[in-house]
């Protein structure tokens, strides 16, 4: 994986035997440009960008083995690495939370830019696929992102039956929680440092 700093952003390239990914994450555009080739995953990524205010440009997203699991997981790894490189967690609020309704679904997201990776959710999906995306991709993406961004993320389902609504509510709340955690502030840690 290679990382290049640019004005207001970071370019990450990841090339393995399974995938080739090149993305740019920035603090300016607030939308998704390009495509992963998985329509519903693109929809979730664009939702995240819109509510977090972050811009994401996908230059290359290619599966060499045709396995979506690898593509979605490695995309999370790449995006998480870009996020970690782009932000100094000691200069932001660090904590963020949001709850977002979507029809019958209500999902809360709680974020800590702690330097300690941990991901947890209290719900499972009831179907194997949402549109063209395997539902396991949601967790694989989040784990990849969280482990490489080195942040803590909890999702809590208050209500919800429709898996499309649940996943979209979760991504909206994640974006809003990230936006709040990234607000400028002094270091918020008793240790005085975030690794």
From Swiss-Prot:
InterPro entries assigned to the protein according to its UniProt record, in alphabetical order: IGPD_sf, ImidazoleglycerolP_deHydtase, ImidazoleglycerP_deHydtase_CS, Ribosomal_Su5_D2-typ_SF
Catalytic activity: D-erythro-1-(imidazol-4-yl)glycerol 3-phosphate = 3-(imidazol-4-yl)-2-oxopropyl phosphate + H2O
Stated family: Belongs to the imidazoleglycerol-phosphate dehydratase family.
EC code(s) of this entry: 4.2.1.19
GO molecular function: imidazoleglycerol-phosphate dehydratase activity
Organism: Thermotoga neapolitana (strain ATCC 49049 / DSM 4359 / NBRC 107923 / NS-E)
Pathway noted in the entry: Amino-acid biosynthesis; L-histidine biosynthesis; L-histidine from 5-phospho-alpha-D-ribose 1-diphosphate: step 6/9
Keyword presence, Ligase: no
Single Gene Ontology BP annotation: L-histidine biosynthetic process
Pfam families in the record: IGPD (PF00475)
Subcellular location field: Cytoplasm
Descriptive protein name: Imidazoleglycerol-phosphate dehydratase
Keyword Lyase tagged: yes
A cellular component term, taken from the record's GO annotations: cytoplasm
This protein's UniProt keywords: Amino-acid biosynthesis, Cytoplasm, Histidine biosynthesis, Lyase
Highest taxon above the source species: Bacteria
């Amino acid at each position: 994986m290679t990382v290049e700093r640019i004005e207001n952003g970071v370019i990450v390239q990841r090339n393995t035997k399974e995938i080739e990914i090149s993305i740019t994450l920035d603090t300016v555009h607030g939308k998704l440009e390009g495509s992963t080739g998985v329509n519903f995953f693109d929809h979730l990524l664009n939702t995240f960008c819109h509510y977090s205010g972050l811009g994401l440009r996908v230059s290359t997203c290619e599966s060499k083995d045709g396995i979506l699991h690898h593509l979605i997981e490695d995309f999370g790894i790449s995006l998480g690495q870009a996020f970690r490189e782009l932000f100094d967690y000691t200069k932001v609020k660090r904590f963020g939370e949001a709850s977002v309704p979507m029809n019958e679904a209500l999902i809360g997201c709680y974020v800590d830019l702690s330097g300690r990776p941990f991901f947890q959710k209290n719900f499972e999906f009831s179907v194997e696929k949402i549109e063209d995306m395997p539902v396991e991709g949601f967790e694989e993406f989040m784990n990849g992102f969280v482990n490489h961004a080195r942040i803590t993320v909890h999702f809590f389902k208050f209500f919800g039956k429709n898996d499309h609504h649940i996943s979209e509510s979760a991504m909206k709340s994640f974006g809003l929680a990230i936006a709040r955690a990234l607000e400028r502030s002094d270091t918020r840690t008793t240790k005085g440092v975030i690794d």
